[in-house]
């Protein structure tokens, strides 16, 4: 991960040393991945899903400096998930108390076929400190998606012969995530950060239409149930939440009425 393998020359060098497969830097674009493939006769592995480090190729020294825990040795203290203030050169406050270094999670599920066509032969899913449910759901989703591609594209085949029967329908939105980004796959984009919170917002389940004395009128994309815990971003962009006491049609009665802004506030169900 931290070897910063982003040029054909470096991949050729590693292959010459005896490496049989090379993990490419996650910052590479699709065109750069394909260029490495065309120049090098070695299997390539790329990141497709999971948490992203704000440091280039995960080479971070801040955790060690501030907390005595080396991120480069697997003891990251999650410095980039903290709140920061941003001031200009004159000391004027631009942003206060925002998670300015917190990246969204990578999700290239919609780009698997493009990655295969670019020469990728192995997929890497980040899983540090993830639980069994996360691993099961995410790997099952990618396995299912790959199998769909292989059925249409006989020129591709599985590397193993094992078969798995799923008793559930995988859904990436139901596992922990900070919002999703494709990162730099098609070049630099401005939507890679999660400034409001480093926590998992969960799956979107509805939109607030009106707030009355003791209940909230919602337009739901998912059914609500008594006891649900719901989250939303308040007018200051801070993450808030409440517990549902009961549900009557499109009316939600919270156990304790929160201050919910009405202007198309999205409700999410945390994972």
Where are these regions (language model features)?
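Conserved small/polar residues in nucleotide/adenosyl-binding loops
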Residues: 265-271
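Residues lining hydrophobic/aromatic ligand-binding pockets adjacent to catalytic sites
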Residues: 19
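Active-site pocket-lining/capping segments in soluble small-molecule metabolic enzymes
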Residues: 1-5, 9, 23-122, 129-154, ...
